[in-house]
Amino acid sequence: MKMTLIAILTCAAVLVLHTTAAEELEAESQLMEVGMPDTELAAVDEERLFECSVSCEIEKEGNKDCKKKKCKGGWKCKFNMCVKV
């Protein structure tokens, strides 16, 4: 009787560990899929950074005060760079 109980508990523990590992793998794969657009967002961020600093340099060359370019979509220009607000 004790051996049967031990066998059942062991199987249950293995099943729980296997299920947990499978859930972690599934969550990890979903994060990888969601993470793919981050590279595209990084490219957009670099473009915004470039646009902001270039516009400020152009204004400085004209012997005018550097008026920071207003960035759109939750971004602002700070230290000649677009930063997320």
From Swiss-Prot:
Expression sites by tissue: Expressed by the venom gland.
InterPro entries given in the database record: Hwtx-2-like
SUPFAM superfamilies on file: omega toxin-like
UniProt KW Disulfide bond keyword: yes
Keywords: Disulfide bond, Neurotoxin, Postsynaptic neurotoxin, Secreted, Signal, Toxin
Disulfide bonds: C52-C66, C56-C77, C71-C82
Removed propeptide positions: 23-48
UniProt GO MF annotations: toxin activity
Gene Ontology cellular component annotations, sorted alphabetically: extracellular region; host cell postsynaptic membrane
Domain of life, source organism: Eukaryota
Locations listed in the record: Secreted
Range of residues in the leader sequence: 1-22
Function: Neurotoxin active on both insects and mammals.
Protein family membership: Belongs to the neurotoxin 12 (Hwtx-2) family. 02 (Hwtx-2) subfamily.
Complexes and interactors: Monomer.
Protein name: U4-theraphotoxin-Hhn1a
